[in-house]
UniProtKB/Swiss-Prot annotation:
Pfam families assigned to the protein according to its UniProt record, in alphabetical order: SmpB
Natural source organism: Synechococcus sp. (strain RCC307)
Keyword RNA-binding in annotation: yes
MF GO annotations: RNA binding
UniProt-listed GO biological process terms: trans-translation
Record function comment: Required for rescue of stalled ribosomes mediated by trans-translation. Binds to transfer-messenger RNA (tmRNA), required for stable association of tmRNA with ribosomes. tmRNA and SmpB together mimic tRNA shape, replacing the anticodon stem-loop with SmpB. tmRNA is encoded by the ssrA gene; the 2 termini fold to resemble tRNA(Ala) and it encodes a 'tag peptide', a short internal open reading frame. During trans-translation Ala-aminoacylated tmRNA acts like a tRNA, entering the A-site of stalled ribosomes, displacing the stalled mRNA.
Keyword RNA-binding: yes
Chief location of this protein within or outside the cell: cytoplasm
Family listed: Belongs to the SmpB family.
Domain of life: Bacteria
Identification of the protein by name: SsrA-binding protein
Length: 166
């Protein structure tokens, strides 16, 4: 019986490691109102995988487009792998293909026809041994929307702290 307890803990630890967050675009949720999300695969080179696992990815200026029926990730900087030479390293800002089902891409294309919507990379994470990218369908926020959202969050924080004091 004692062996089963250790196995369960090890399995839980393994599951947590399998869902590890590798890069996050925190500013995206501030600048955009996220209406829908989609988890996609990402086509990477070997040195890109090693660099992402080392935490060398920057999603801040990234965006996604649908070109020729394929999802593409643009303007995401993945730094070169330190152990690789310049000859074997990848180009940091290259266009990367995203892997999604045709029906998901068609659904996104239909939603993107609405004016003002865009696809933004939200985070890169591990799912098992696969690197996945979560993209969000977002609508840009105006300055007053950002202020209103900050005010709402501050009010909720104040309310929670007031309830704790009671």
């Amino acid at each position: 019986m004692a062996g089963k307890g250790k196995g369960a803990k090890a399995a839980a630890k393994k599951r947590l490691e399998a869902q590890k967050l590798l890069a996050d675009n925190r500013q995206a949720r501030h600048q955009y109102e996220i209406l829908d999300t989609l988890e996609t695969g990402i086509e990477l080179l070997g040195t890109e995988v090693k660099a992402i696992r080392a935490g060398k990815a920057n999603l801040r200026d990234g965006f996604c487009l649908i070109r020729q029926g394929q999802l593409q990730l643009h303007n995401v900087h993945i730094a070169g792998h330190e152990q690789a030479s310049r000859y074997f390293n990848h180009e940091p800002l290259r266009v990367r293909r995203l892997l999604a089902h045709r029906r998901e891409i068609d659904k996104l294309r239909g939603q993107l026809d609405t004016k003002g919507l865009t696809l933004i990379p939200l985070n890169i994470h591990l799912k098992g041994s696969w690197i996945k990218l979560t993209i969000g369908l977002g609508k840009g926020r105006k300055l007053h929307d950002k202020r209103q959202e900050e005010r709402r969050k501050q009010d909720q924080k104040d309310l929670r702290s007031a309830l704790k004091r009671l």
